Each structure stands twice: as C-alpha cells, then as structure tokens.
C-alpha cells in the first residue's frame, strides 16, 4: 500500500476523527494526500468494473469487509449492517471449487486486519484457531464454526443447497449467501467490551458513548476502511485526529496503519480524541448534555464546524450555546449543521447510546 504524505500541523479545533473534510480548512499536503487516495480508489474501482462488469463494483468500507482473490475473480463480502456474508466468483472453470475455498477461509479468518490487504487480490487470509466470525455464524446444524472440518462440511452443504447463478450480460456470477445470527452486532461488541472499559476509565469517557461511536462508525468491523482513509473500529484518520492524539501524548509523527488496525490501539486513540473534544476543544460548553451533543457531532465533522453553527467566533459560540437548553442545542445541530452527514450522525450516535445505557 502506498505510503502517504505526512500532514503538517493543523489547528486542532478544525480536525475531525472519522472524516477528512467537512468545510474546515486543511493544508495543501493533506489535500494532496486525500486526492491521491481518491485516485487510488478510483483506479481500484475501475479495475474491478473491467473484470466484473458494470454495476458490479463492490469495495471494502466502514461496515463492509470485501476481499478479492483468484486474480480478482472471487470475492468475499461481509455486510456487517445487514448481517450477511456473500461469496461470489466469476471463475470460468471450477467455480464451485473457488467458492468452497473462499467460504472456508472467510468463516475461519482471524482478527488481524493489519495482515490483510483489502485493495489487492493477494491471498493473505490465514485460517485461525480463534475465527473472528465464531459465534456470529452457525452451520446448517445450528453449531458455531471454529474448525476447518466443520467449515468444509458447511461449505459443501452451501454449494449443494444454496448455490445461485446470475448473468450480468458480461459474466456468469456464482454465489452463496450466509445469514449471520440475529444478534451478530452484540456478539461483535462483546469482543471489545474489555478494551472499551479500559479506555473509558483511562480517559473518563462514558462506555455507552464509545460503544455508540463504534457501532455508528464501523458496526464493530475491525477491518473497517473508508474512502477518506479512516481506519478501524472507531474510524480514526492517521494524519488528523491520530496525529492530534499522538501530539497530546508527547509522541511525534502519526499512528501507523497497523497501529490503528489493532483494536485496542484504535479504541484507545478514538477515546482519547473524544476526551480532547470534551475537555479541551469544546470545554467552554457548560452543560454536559449540550457538550456531549457537540462532541458527538465534532467527532464526525470537526469542532470548528460545530462552533461555527452558532458563531464564527469560537468563544462567542460557546457563550451562545451556554444560553440554550440541551434540547435546543440538539435541534440546532441536527437541522442547521452544514453537513447532512454530521446532522444524521448526531441522531444515530445519540440513539445508539441510549440503547447501550439501558443495558
């Protein structure tokens, strides 16, 4: 994977964690870096379209694991929102064999995103004794899948009973789809509860907020990537929020991709950034509920854009917020923030946080 340009120092107030541009000002190096990644993704999508056909482009995202193999002729797609696993191939010879191999590897893949290149067809998926999907999928007998023998038997069952084919005019696409268990989201969340609790205690951030951010950002997908090159469970961008957190901790440079793909490191960094937003960048907001709404929105779109909703002067913006009720602050941010994504983001995270508080 291409090494990216380092980002020069930016005013911390103008940094968001999960996005790279929300109307805030970035320097030329960051713009060039972002444009370079956009070009890379555009080329990758174009290559997939050439091989698979028009409207058949599927690329990894925050809530979608997509891995190509077999010279891009086979792909595994886990939709963590819908709870479905779709294995497809356009291989002209022995398509069932290609599907079988991909099914087994997907069911038994480990929890090490840094070892997998989602932007190539390199077959770098290794079978793990502790599969990431263990408990999130059961076989045709209702049993979770840990060992290769059970995965192989399930693959044979799927190919015999659920194999489908369709034509897109260019290729015949063979596929099988596996439904994850109904509570797959909770199963994934449970994997990270210990890490969340540790970061919560370390930075004084509510566990329910961390979990709500993780659910909204990645649906607890540790392989999460985005077109803005945000990485991991909490979708941290190396050169913005990642660098800001490192600087606050007395570290130089930026967190590496492998660092942010490590679940514990990602949760620690994302939570540290939430604490910075709460205690420093938006610390002038007195009411804790109003400040929480501002922090949530800022995690997506930057603290600067949040304050500018109320005034172009940062101090005056905080003063205005302090005259408002929390309900009015919420209403303002969900209706007047210039970014539709940030407006929806506050609603989603706030709703998710309520559900975690009830548990």
From Swiss-Prot:
CDD domains, per the entry: LT_MltC_MltE (cd16893)
Swiss-Prot/TrEMBL keywords: Cell outer membrane, Cell wall biogenesis/degradation, Lipoprotein, Lyase, Membrane, Palmitate, Signal
E.C. designation(s): 4.2.2.n1
GO cellular component, one term: cell outer membrane
Biological processes per GO annotation: cell wall macromolecule catabolic process; cell wall organization; peptidoglycan metabolic process
Main location, first listed in the record: membrane
Residues with lipid group (N-palmitoyl cysteine): 17
InterPro entries: Lysozyme-like_dom_sf, Murein_transglycosylaseC, Murein_transglycosylaseC_N, Transglyc_AS, Transglycosylase_SLT_dom_1
EC class name: lyase
Lipidation residue positions, type S-diacylglycerol cysteine: 17
SUPFAM superfamilies per record: Lysozyme-like (SSF53955)
Biological function: Murein-degrading enzyme. May play a role in recycling of muropeptides during cell elongation and/or cell division.
Family to which the UniProt record says this protein belongs: Belongs to the transglycosylase Slt family.
NCBIfam families documented for this protein: PRK11671.1
Protein name: Membrane-bound lytic murein transglycosylase C
Organism: Escherichia fergusonii (strain ATCC 35469 / DSM 13698 / CCUG 18766 / IAM 14443 / JCM 21226 / LMG 7866 / NBRC 102419 / NCTC 12128 / CDC 0568-73)
